[in-house]
């Protein structure tokens, strides 16, 4: 792990996993300005199958824009997605949520809290389909959350996402190792009974079919 402070340059050629989170508007604006200067390096990393997890504001920033209050701020335009203000209905989308995702044999559970409605372009697939009896996803309309492109995951699910969903953590680790080693890897199984039990409890509580 290499610590990088605000204003310092980042060498992504040695990175195995990149995480983009969200935060208060002021701090997110400062971070996005730095990221704009790294746009092509990040694009090369993503297109080269680098493992990347982007949550909430970090997910929005990967698209053409992100929202800061009523202001639309320039995004990285690495992925074909855009975020718009809410129309009629709820202002913020706040709820526990569960998804069906090709990356996990268990439902992907988490917590969403976002005002923006994110629309995917035709070239992108969602990270998962909303299967809980509550939850909104990308836009409260499509029935899907996030996006999955190469080894890049974008999502509105906080949680913590990886602690609640071991299969997603395993996917990112395996993707990073395979890119580094140039060959398929099989991860050594860890004891994750507690995490899976918590996942199953939330899936049942959220009304996931078959849970």
Over which residues does each language-model region extend?
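Cysteine-nucleophile active-site neighborhood
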Residues: 24-100, 105
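Structural motif
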Residues: 17-21, 53, 156
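Glycine-rich His-Gly loop
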Residues: 20-24, 57, 115, 159
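Short, acidic Gly/Pro/Ser/Thr-rich loop/turn segments
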Residues: 25-27, 86, 117-120, 160-164
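A glycine-centered loop/beta-turn motif at secondary-structure junctions
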Residues: 139-175
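Conserved beta-strand scaffold positions in the cores of enzyme catalytic domains, especially
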Residues: 3, 78, 110-112, 152-156
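Pocket-forming structural segment of enzyme catalytic cores
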Residues: 71-145
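N-terminal beta1-alpha1 cap of cysteine-dependent amidohydrolase-like domains
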Residues: 1-47, 163-211
